From Swiss-Prot:
Subunit structure: The RNAP catalytic core consists of 2 alpha, 1 beta, 1 beta' and 1 omega subunit. When a sigma factor is associated with the core the holoenzyme is formed, which can initiate transcription.
GO MF assignments: DNA binding; DNA-directed RNA polymerase activity
Keyword entries, A-Z: DNA-directed RNA polymerase, Nucleotidyltransferase, Transcription, Transferase
Taxon lineage: Bacteria, Pseudomonadati, Pseudomonadota, Gammaproteobacteria, Oceanospirillales
Keyword Transcription: yes
Gene3D superfamilies: 3.90.940.10
Catalytic function, reaction form: RNA(n) + a ribonucleoside 5'-triphosphate = RNA(n+1) + diphosphate
Species this protein is from: Hahella chejuensis (strain KCTC 2396)
Domain of life: Bacteria
Family: Belongs to the RNA polymerase subunit omega family.
Role description: Promotes RNA polymerase assembly. Latches the N- and C-terminal regions of the beta' subunit thereby facilitating its interaction with the beta and alpha subunits.
GO biological process terms on file: DNA-templated transcription
Disulfide-linked positions: none
GO CC terms in record: DNA-directed RNA polymerase complex
Protein name: DNA-directed RNA polymerase subunit omega
């Protein structure tokens, strides 16, 4: 399993604060609302999966805002 770093995620998100909000929203979607992960699960916690999705550029804040509507 590759380790996800904040720097990997910041290539796709403007700042650390937005990263925290984005990752927490996505992790909540995966764990509580049954959304399917966009990366392989690999027995990780939902927060790690969310960070891996962000680092891969698969999740953006715009996508999550649209999903809330």
């Amino acid at each position: 399993m590759a380790r996800v770093t904040v720097e990997d995620c910041l290539d796709h998100v403007d700042n650390r604060f937005e990263l925290v909000m984005l990752a927490s929203k996505r992790a909540r979607q995966i764990s509580q609302y049954g959304k399917d992960p966009k990366v392989e699960w690999e027995n990780d916690k939902p927060t790690v999966v969310a960070l891996r999705e962000i680092a891969a550029g698969l999740i953006t804040s715009e996508m999550l805002e649209q999903d809330e509507d």
